UniProtKB/Swiss-Prot annotation:
It comes from Photorhabdus laumondii subsp. laumondii (strain DSM 15139 / CIP 105565 / TT01) (Photorhabdus luminescens subsp. laumondii). Gene3D superfamilies: 3.30.56.10, Bira Bifunctional Protein, Domain 2, Ferrodoxin-fold anticodon-binding domain, Nucleic acid-binding proteins, Phenylalanyl-trna Synthetase, Chain B, domain 3. Its cofactor is Mg(2+). Keywords: Aminoacyl-tRNA synthetase, ATP-binding, Cytoplasm, Ligase, Magnesium, Metal-binding, Nucleotide-binding, Protein biosynthesis, RNA-binding, tRNA-binding. Residues 401-476 form the B5 domain. The gene is pheT. This is Phenylalanine--tRNA ligase beta subunit. Tetramer of two alpha and two beta subunits. SUPFAM superfamilies: Anticodon-binding domain of PheRS, Class II aaRS and biotin synthetases, Nucleic acid-binding proteins, PheT/TilS domain, Putative DNA-binding domain. The lineage of its organism: Bacteria, Pseudomonadati, Pseudomonadota, Gammaproteobacteria, Enterobacterales.
Amino acid sequence: MKFSELWLREWVNPAISSETLSDQITMIGLEVDGVEAVAGQFHGVVVGEVVQCAQHPNADKLRVTKVNVGGERLLDIVCGAPNCRLGLKVAVATVGAVLPGDFKIKAAKLRGEPSEGMLCSFSELGISEDHDGIIELPIDAPLGVDLREYLKLDDKVIEISITPNRADCLSIIGVARDVAVANKMPLSEPQIEAVKPTTDAIFPIRVEATEACPRYLGRVIKNINVKAATPQWMREKLRRGGIRSIDPIVDVTNYVLLELGQPLHAFDLERLNGSITVRMAKQDEKLVLLDGTEANLSTDTLVISDEKQAVAMAGIFGGEHSGVNEETQNILLECAFFAPLAIAGRARRYGLHTDASHRYERGVDPQLQHKAIERTTQLLIDICGGEAGPIIDVTDESQLPQSATITLRREKLDRLIGHYIPDEQVGDILTHLGCKVTIQENCWQAVAPSWRFDVEIEEDLVEEVARIYGYNNIPDVPIRADLIMKKHRETDLSLQRVKTVLVDRGYQEAITYSFVDPKIQALLHPQQQALMLPNPISADMSAMRLSLLTGLLTTVVYNQNRQQNRVRLFETGLRFVPDENADQGIRQELMLGGVITGNRFEEHWSLEKQSVDFFDMKGDLEAVLELTGKLSKISFRADVNPALHPGQSAGIYLENEYIGYIGVVHPELERKLDLNGRTVVFEVLWNKLASRVVPDAKEISRFPSNRRDIAIVVPENVAVEDVLAECKKVGVNHIVGINLFDVYCGKGVAEGHKSLAISFILQDTARTLEEEEIAATINKCVAVLKQRFQASLRD
């Protein structure tokens, strides 16, 4: 937005320089993008009047004039401007004047005729780029007055960038309010009084779309002179605001737009049929706009219509059919509040962007319309004459925005700003901003003014106090933090440590969605009911996962479809299990899961291709379990899992408590999920592994160890794990290592049995074991195994 500094100072005039004022405007949140002088540097240019104008005898395009500048004699000046004529008030650069670019005016002869100065155009004075002709000043401009003083050219145009929430500052009054508060000064508003009707003329108005248009005001003004000249002061303010002067009616509505921030529109009353209706556009309805283009209206576009057709696009652009022209005598002046959501995006849809739509999209003061229509009416009558009728007011109060009561707590204010601002000063700032403030204990109750519709929550009030108090007035305080070492128990096992082990073993971490395809999940967990989402992203993401397995297997398929056949992934994340006894009926548990498929090793010329199997995954998992120090207490037991191969899977138990599973994916599931080749998975409850057993340091024996091997035959259904556990119990004092190194079934072993080859490492920390002691320990183990498992030594 652009505006004149002098115009702003008519409303509030702090005793500060232009530079300081610009900095202040920026610091209160209205960023100044640029400041430019209204005119170039020149002097010696005065107001004059052309009293004689004749054709140059020696040039077709030049005129010889005599110009009165209020001195003792008339000046002879040769001029080539096409609009030079008798009686015109002009800007005269007299002899000795210096124009922009250090151009000095001297007496000279042009084609034989003397010229004692120059009649200037706007471009020659650096005021604008208009060089079509010389400046035409009002007929009442006083002769001989310095042009800089008359046009108030010692002024600057300030351009500010307005954030979308500060639509109230798309006007002089909005900027002036903030400047006044920042300088603790009163606002000098112009007196706006109600215009008494001098005619009973009215025009019927009906609002159908009350939600989109809660308030619509109309006023008939008759016998208006549309050919009257817009005052120079108004044209200059418009020009400095970036708006071109068109005619007095448009100029006045644009002036009030810049002054108060309220868009208005004038219809030619004689070109309206019957009545005005504010409604949504009809299907396939068209409207020819003021610029001559035709818009094909969509049904969500708000329009102003008469009894025959749409006559304007509400809040965006007027229609050609009802537009004011040189023949207009009677007008209907419109001033309305359109809801931002009813206007937002519509202008861009039709390739338009107008000052009105820019403001309506962001919001205007819903209580401003009466004030704006009275201001516009008075200016129109002062400039164009006419007779004003009464205001027709169609308002639905229930649809108008209402200001909320907001509580600002002292604790919240101090915490967010980081600086104490006295209570009295906080109250003054809010009051001067237009809020209705009630002071309570340690807080303020504030109702924002109607023009500050962006102030809705407590943080908004904190921002208002901070920016008016001045960010520069908030002292810089170095950031302080107490560096307290986090307590770390030696028994805690870091999840990051586990991830590092898996990465070192060739795995990559995956992060999959907690939302999964319920159909795939049902294949993996047919007996469990999942939590379904009421508003899912899509049908294949409509269930909360019961395990990490669904996401991991889906990721494997995704990679295999992209020629990545060797896949090793792990993931940590929550699973969501419906449980009536859990908080809010959902049990959330952190899980650790993994999956491998493809070759055991990366492809290499010296290695044969070997597919991964159950024991590859078991080895990787045992590397993780080793970190807990509980590996000796963890057992793998044959178990039934519908997602896993019945002969190549196991449940994982910690001291008889189930904590997870491991196994090869069931062949039937491999087919249904389009998995390519054997796929092995595991999943364990992380909270069961998150603590570790701190190892006890023991003295390394200086005495020799002894190895003894035995081969025993046991029934085929006996678990090796149980055999080894019994041996450990027997030889707890001397056996320091037990290892299964061979399993054999076949010739020499009875059917339904298997041969287990077990090695024992025996050692004592205090002495060398005698052969008799070693033999006694081994014999005792064999005896226990015979009794417990019907084992026998193999021949």
